[in-house]
A protein has these predicted regions:
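Short, acidic, small-residue-rich periplasmic hinge/interaction motif at the N-terminus
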Residues: 22-71, 107
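Extracytoplasmic beta-strand/coil segments of soluble accessory domains associated
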Residues: 62, 79-118
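Short acidic/polar hinge/loop motifs at secondary-structure boundaries
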Residues: 118-144
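Periplasmic-side early beta-strands and strand-to-turn transitions of outer-membrane beta-barrels
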Residues: 171, 175-178, 195-298
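C-terminal beta-signal and adjacent terminal beta-strands/loops
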Residues: 212, 218, 498, 554-557, ...
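Outer membrane beta-barrel strand-and-loop segments of large Gram-negative receptors
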Residues: 351-367, 407, 520-526, 532, ...
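Structural signature of Gram-negative outer-membrane beta-barrels, strongest in the C-terminal barrel
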Residues: 375-385, 396-555, 596, 604-608, ...
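Gram-negative outer-membrane beta-barrel transporters
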Residues: 417-418, 551-555, 559, 564-568, ...
Length: 725
C-alpha cells in the first residue's frame, strides 16, 4: 500500500528536482558570529543574508520561522502551525493547544525552549500539550533530530526554540494588536503587545486570550468502550475552550553586558466530551443551552514561569552566559465524583477533583563561549534541574516524586576547509528520581469482595511502589556542511542521544479517562538510547530551489506505550496499555521545493514519509504518522496574497499490535487571502483562510480523538486582523 504513496512522492519530486524553500529560510540554533552580540541585537530583516550563510555551516536540518511564515499559517494553535512544516505533525488537544511530533518522535522527546528556559508542560502524557501563547512566537527555530547536546535528554527527537523578539531600531513606544475568529468553534481571540525602548532599557508586555465554543464535527456518533455514543447537531458537547497568556520582559542592553528578566503566565480551561469520559451514559450527551459553557468533566492548566539571563562580553574572544529559571506546571482534571468501588466515600473537600498534578521546576545554566581568531567557536556549558511533584484527587495515575538532572557539554563549530564546516560536541548527563508509594484501600477492598487470589491482592496492594533510580549516559554528534558551489549544498549529521524515562513511563498506574485507557508504567525501564543519521541535499538559483532530507534513527532501547490486549482488572477501564522498551527503527524522507513561475507567482510543494519498525514484534510502532503531500499556488501582487493549497493525507495501515488502522485517503483544499496596507503611521494585515473547503470527512491517525473514531474538523473560516504601530 505504501509503495503507491512513495511513488506519488517521487512523481511529484521528479518534475520539481530544483524546488524547495530557499536556504535563507533556515537557521542554526547557535550561530557563529565574529562579535558575540551581533546575533542577539540584530533584527530579522538585517540578518536575512547572514541566516543563509549560517545555515550553510550547520550539519543539522533546521527550520527558521519568521513573522511572514507564522502569520501565513496562523491558526490560534501554535503546534498546529508547526505541523505545516515537512516532518512535523501535531496531536491536537482542544482548540488552543497541541503536542508536536517531529519525524515520528513526540512527547518528552521534543523540547520547547523559551528564552533559554525549557518548558515542562508535556510531563504527563498524550492529552497535555504545549502551554504557550500562539500569538507570541516570532521568531522560532525548529531543530529536527537530536538536540541533546545543548538542551539535555528531553531533546532527543528535536527542539523548538522561541527566541526573544528583536529589539526595535527606533526609541520610544511601539506595539501591535491581533484579533482572530473562526467558524468551527464560533469563537476567537485577541492579543495586545506594547513595548518601550529608552536608551539601554527595553520593556515589553503581551496579553492574549482565546474563547472557543463547542467544536463542529462531521460525525454524528463515536465509539467509546465498545459503546455507540451519539453526537447531536454535529456539535461535540462540552468541548469549549478558554485560554489566556501574558508575558512581561525587561532587558538591559549595555555595551558589554546584556541582562533580561521575564515572567509569564499561560492557562487553559477545556471541557471533555462527556460521552467519552468515565462510565458511558447517553443522558450526559444530550444537548445543553449554550455552546460556550464548560461543565464537568473539564480540565484546567496553569503554567507560571520566571527567568533571568545575563550575557557578559569579557573580551573580544570570550563571552559568559548565565540563566536561572523557575516554573510551575499545574494541571487539574475535574469530573463529577464517581466511584468504581462501592466502599469509596465522597471526599469532603474538592469532591469533584479527580486528578491534580503540581510540578515545580528550578533550572540553571552556565555557558562560556570562545570565539577563536580563525573563526571557530567553542562552547563549554553546564546545566542542572530539580523538580518536585505533588498529586491530589480521588483518582490515581501518577505518584509524588522528586527528580534531579545535570549535564556538562563541549561543542565546536567552525570552518575546516574552503566551503566545508564542522559542528561537533560531547555531553555527559546524570539523572536521579525518587518515587513515593501509594496504597489505595478501596481497590484492596474491591478485589477482596471479588474473591481475588492472595497473589492478585499483593500485586495490586500498591498502585505505586517506593523506589529510586539513577542514570548516567553520554551523547555526542558530528556534522558537516559542504557548500559545493553557489547553487549546491550538502549536509550530513551523525549523533548518539539518550533520554531519561519520564515519570509516567516509570510509575503510571490508573484509569485515565482523558486518554481513554488504563496506563501502566514499568519502574525498571532504562534510558532511551539511539543513533541518528540524517542528511540534506539542496539546490537553488533565481528560478528554482529544492531540498531533500532523508533520515534514519535506530534505538537500542526505545520506550513506547503498547496496547497489551489484556483486560484491566479495574472496572470501566478497557484494555491495559503498558510502557515497555524495544529496539526500534525510524526512517523517512522530507522534500520541499519552490518554483518562481513569475515575479508574482510561486508554486510550492512539500511532502514527508515516516517509517517505523518495532524490531521485536516486526510491526510498526504505535501512533506512526501517515505520509503527507501538499502543494500550493500563490499569487502575490502589490499588497495582496492569494494562495490555493491541495493537501493529501495517506491512510495508515502499518500499525502496532491491537492498534486500530486509519483507512481512507484524505484530500483537502484550503484557500487563503491576505491584504497588507498602511494607515497613517501604522501597518495592518487582514487575512481570511478557508480550511477544508469541501468539508471532507477524514480521520487523522495522530489525533487525540482517533481512538474514539471522531473525525477531524470540517470546513472552517479563519479571519485574522493585525495592526502594528
Amino acid at each position: 500500500m505504501y509503495c503507491r504513496y512513495i511513488c506519488y512522492l517521487l512523481l511529484y519530486l521528479i518534475p520539481t528536482v530544483a524546488l524547495a524553500e530557499p536556504f535563507a529560510s533556515r537557521l542554526d540554533s547557535v550561530a557563529v558570529e565574529p562579535h558575540p552580540f551581533d546575533e542577539t541585537l540584530q533584527t530579522v530583516e538585517v540578518r536575512a543574508n547572514s541566516k543563509r550563510l549560517q545555515t550553510m555551516r550547520i550539519g543539522q536540518t533546521i527550520e527558521w520561522l519568521d513573522s511572514t511564515y507564522l502569520t501565513k499559517h496562523f491558526t490560534g494553535n501554535f503546534a498546529a502551525t508547526l505541523s505545516t512544516l515537512p516532518g512535523v505533525n501535531v496531536i491536537t488537544i482542544g482548540s488552543g493547544y497541541g503536542k508536536p511530533v517531529i519525524r515520528g518522535l513526540g512527547f518528552n522527546r521534543i523540547a520547547y525552549v523559551d528564552g533559554g528556559l525549557k518548558q515542562e508542560g508535556q510531563q504527563w502524557g498524550a492529552d497535555h500539550g504545549l502551554e504557550v501563547d500562539a500569538f507570541d512566537q516570532d521568531p522560532v527555530q525548529v531543530i529536527k533530530g537530536a538536540g541533546s547536546l545543548l538542551y539535555g535528554s528531553d531533546a532527543l527527537g528535536g527542539v523548538i526554540v522561541r527566541q526573544p523578539a528583536a529589539t526595535p531600531h527606533k526609541q520610544g513606544l511601539y506595539g501591535s494588536y491581533t484579533m482572530m475568529g473562526q467558524s468551527s468553534t464560533m469563537g476567537g481571540g485577541g492579543s495586545l503587545m506594547m513595548g518601550y525602548l529608552h536608551g539601554a532599557h527595553h520593556i515589553r508586555l503581551r496579553m492574549s486570550g482565546q474563547y472557543h465554543g463547542d467544536r463542529n464535527v462531521t460525525a454524528d456518533s463515536i465509539t467509546y468502550l465498545t459503546r455507540w455514543i451519539p453526537i447531536y447537531n454535529h456539535r461535540l458537547k462540552n468541548s469549549a475552550t478558554q485560554t489566556y497568556a501574558s508575558q512581561l520582559r525587561y532587558e538591559w542592553l549595555g555595551e558589554q553586558v546584556k541582562a533580561s528578566l521575564q515572567a509569564s503566565v499561560n492557562g487553559e480551561r477545556s471541557g471533555f466530551f462527556p460521552g467519552a469520559h468515565g462510565v458511558p451514559d447517553l443522558k450526559r450527551v444530550l444537548p445543553d443551552k449554550s455552546r460556550y459553557n464548560i461543565e464537568l468533566p473539564y480540565s484546567t492548566v496553569r503554567q507560571i514561569s520566571t527567568q533571568g539571563s545575563l550575557q557578559w562580553r569579557v573580551s573580544p574572544q570570550w563571552q559568559l552566559v548565565g540563566e536561572l529559571g523557575w516554573q510551575q506546571n499545574l494541571r487539574r482534571e475535574l469530573s463529577a465524583f464517581h466511584t468504581h468501588y462501592g466502599t469509596m466515600q465522597r471526599p469532603v473537600q474538592d469532591a469533584d477533583l479527580e486528578f491534580e498534578f503540581d510540578l515545580k521546576t528550578v533550572s540553571a545554566r552556565l555557558q562560556a563561549n570562545y570565539y577563536a581568531p580563525w573563526g571557530g567557536k567553542w562552547t563549554l556549558a553546564t546545566d542542572g534541574q530539580y523538580q518536585w511533584h505533588k498529586r491530589r484527587g480521588y483518582g490515581f495515575l501518577l505518584p509524588d516524586y522528586q527528580r534531579a538532572t545535570s549535564g556538562v557539554s563541549l561543542t565546536y563549530q567552525g570552518r575546516i576547509a574552503q566551503g566545508l564546516y564542522l559542528t561537533s560536541g560531547l555531553r555527559y548527563d546524570l539523572g536521579y528520581i525518587a518515587m513515593s508509594p501509594y496504597h489505595d484501600p478501596y481497590l484492596a477492598d474491591y478485589l477482596q469482595e471479588r474473591g481475588e487470589s492472595s497473589a492478585t491482592l499483593a500485586q495490586y496492594y500498591y498502585s505505586s511502589q517506593e523506589g529510586e533510580r539513577r542514570w548516567h549516559d553520554l551523547s555526542g554528534s558530528v556534522g558537516l556542511a559542504w557548500q559545493i558551489n553557489r547553487h549546491w549544498l550538502w549536509k550530513v549529521n551523525l549523533g548518539r542521544s539518550f533520554r531519561l524515562p519520564g515519570i509516567y513511563e516509570l510509575a503510571a498506574n490508573g484509569i485515565h479517562h482523558g486518554t481513554f485507557r488504563h496506563e501502566v508504567g514499568d519502574p525498571s525501564l532504562g534510558s532511551e538510547q539511539g543513533w541518528l543519521l540524517d542528511s540534506e541535499v539542496g539546490f537553488h538559483n533565481d528560478l528554482w530551489s529544492c531540498t531533500v532530507s532523508p533520515f534514519i534513527t535506530y534505538f537500542t532501547n526505545y520506550i513506547y506505550l503498547q496496547p497489551s490486549g489484556e483486560w484491566s482488572i479495574l472496572p470501566h477501564s478497557g484494555q491495559i496499555y503498558r510502557y515497555q522498551s524495544t529496539r526500534a527503527l525510524f526512517t523517512g524522507i522530507e522534500l520541499e521545493g519552490t518554483w518562481h513561475l513569475h515575479p508574482q507567482w510561486d508554486y510550492h510543494l512539500q511532502g514527508d514519509y515516516v517509517y517505523t519498525y518495532n524490531v521485536a514484534d516486526r510491526l510498526a510502532l504505535p501512533y506512526s504518522p501517515p505520509a503527507r503531500l501538499s502543494h500550493d499556488l500563490t499569487w502575490h501582487p502589490t499588497h495582496w496574497t492569494l494562495s490555493l493549497k491541495h493537501r493529501i493525507i495517506a491512510p495508515q495501515h502499518r500499525i502496532a499490535r491491537n492498534e486500530a488502522p486509519t483507512p481512507g485517503t484524505a484530500t483537502l483544499l484550503d484557500l487563503a487571502v491576505t491584504y497588507d496596507g498602511q494607515l497613517r503611521q501604522s501597518n495592518y494585515r487582514i487575512s481570511l483562510a478557508i480550511q477544508n473547503i469541501l468539508n471532507s470527512r477524514y480521520y487523522d491517525h495522530m489525533s487525540y480523538y482517533r481512538r474514539v473514531n471522531l473525525p477531524e474538523a470540517g470546513r472552517n473560516l479563519l479571519l485574522t486582523i493585525n495592526l502594528s504601530f
